[in-house]
Amino acid sequence: LRFCVLELQVVGFRFDLASVLGRVSAHTFDPQHPLLQAIMNDPQLADTKRIAEPWDVGMGGWQTGNFADGWQEWNDRYRDRVRNFWLSDIDYARRASAAPVGIGGFAIRLAGSSNTFSAERGPLASVNFVAAHDGFTVHDLVSYDVKHNIGNGEQGRDGADTNRSFNHGTEGPTSDPGVLAVRRKAIRN
């Protein structure tokens, strides 16, 4: 990390599956883990941004909101609630003839997820995102209701099953100009 900062002028790092860096046992995460503290307390790294993807694949790996002050975290609760508000609520309302969940859950996320991040850390600890390198792309979110991970050898076991997506009437690729237009509009929204 020091080499990247001092020699390459890197100003920040995103740590993939970052909760593994704070593991003290197979199922326990410690936000004060010596490795995390060493990164935080290194004077040559003091001015860098530290962004954690606050989960890993192990038991007890989901740690959104639990990193120490000085870390920012990807906020998957924001991602999921925005996707619900943007796409899933519409889909649910159409299919179930019921009112969508509404704006309440969306508002708490948009306002900084105070129920996830402590007051000491505040809303700037949250890195809000809708799509990333894992899971559905934005195009997938408006084109598929379910994942189709068959061709990669995992028989569909990989990836999340709850993508909170809405295909706008046709699953996957289509040449229907009406479906394509509404998908493009949804992406712009």
Name each model feature, range by range.
Residues 1-24:
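Active-site groove signature of glycoside hydrolases
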Residues 25, 30-189:
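Conserved alpha/beta catalytic core and glycan-binding cleft of carbohydrate-active enzymes
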